[in-house]
Amino acid sequence: MKTKLILKDEVNCKFEGLALTTRRKLEKKLKFFLPHAFHVPAYKLGRWDGCVGYFTMGGSTFVNCLPTILPILDEEGYGVEIEDHRQHHELKWDTVTQELFSDRQWPANHPAAGQPVVLRDYQVKVINEFLQTPQCLQEIATGAGKTLITAALSYMCEAYGRSIVIVPNKDLVTQTEADYINLGLDVGVYFGDRKEFGKTHTICTWQSLNIMEKRFRDGEQDWGLHAFAEDVVCVMVDEVHQAKADVLKKLLTGAFSNIPIRWGLTGTIPKADHERLSLEVSLGEVTNSLSAHELQDMGVLAQCEVNVLQLQDSVSYGNYQSELTYLTTNTTRLDYMSGLIEKMAQGGNTLVLVDRISAGEGLVERLGDSAVFISGSMKSKNRKDEYDEVSEADNKIIVATYGVAAVGINIPRIFNLVLVEPGKSFVRVIQSIGRGIRKAQDKDHVQIWDITSSAKFSKRHLTERKKFYREAKYPFHIEKVDYK
């Protein structure tokens, strides 16, 4: 039996001539049930099966699903004829060395200010690994200098065309732009009210790209993603675990599907099969991993210790949201937590991460002038000013929501990191700890405080987090606290 495999572009492909039974088998093999489907009305009403699929009954699938598909076709006795519509690119690079940017100097606010920019051994290894595999993901721990790695890759791609770097939030756009400018790269940004075109490298958020395409479709502007991607040979996604958002998958497998060089960096590859496959479909397979523990052993990251404070609460709620509302708004708990945070801050700058704005406001109200609350509504520049102040201050308390500060923000001089009810998301917990373990001139150790409860759902979530701490090799101990 024969089947034709049509490679439409870098990520999308289609099989023609497969028997119905084979298509059903493949569709079932590449179909995953989404755990959150139980809460979606369409699933409850029986209008949706609660699954996400990577092979359609029409034969459409993704190039990075072929390692799963081809062995099944082989078993079924199919011969595969290939029709390749991809644009051909001859990509060759010299091996990168530590001296790539040695003619540039570190900026004033860097621990090595004024010294030449020399890449570390592990950064050179990561960069060369990417150059050998033009479509791949690497799991690189927070604090490894991912922005410098991204800049080196953008620089290496200049010979072939433009690069687009997609980051998860506005703070990271400006942070990445500053590093690119310091390294002498021709860079522009696309987000909010700054829309710069015609630069060799463009840094943007996935939200701004999504809005661009929507406005183009609605006839509100003359350019869309296809025009934006002209002459682009490389798309990089920083903190790629955010790429499981459907929007980003749609971007990378839609308007950006002809871009040949596709790289993803993240501190945390998601655990769930469907989330991981969504990333692999968009960018490529995971080829390398560099853990925070390895970087701690090398002396690049600060050592840490997780102190779990399990507050004893004799309350019972039917669902997690109601329980969380109690745990983050109860006045006795907030009084106890603010007193605890005040004591911690005497030992150095403290970053407190909370799930809800109301909890953050409740804590800052009690902590008074010594604390500042940072949420998504604060302007990006004002947030940056607060983060920068930490490099000078000694007993500053920053209270922030997980969404704002848990990803990619560079605040090295944090001596205490407080996680209030961090939940059970592997990505959130590990990325949040990444905020604390960056090294500074006067810091090689950080205390992490996991404030949780003995209440039903909180207790379950702690069981999950203990697994994460063990896997990441972060030492932890649990103390039960009767705070009332």
Predicted regions and their residues:
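A conserved SF2-helicase RecA2
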Residues: 278-307, 313-315, 427-433, 437-484
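Conserved helicase ATPase core of P-loop NTP-dependent helicases/translocases
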Residues: 174, 186-198, 351, 361-362, ...
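Post-DEXD/H (motif II) to motif III coupling segment of the RecA-like Helicase ATP-binding lobe
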Residues: 69, 233-234, 239-305, 469
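Walker A/P-loop
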Residues: 118, 132-157
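Conserved pre-motif I regulatory segment
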Residues: 39, 45-55, 81-139
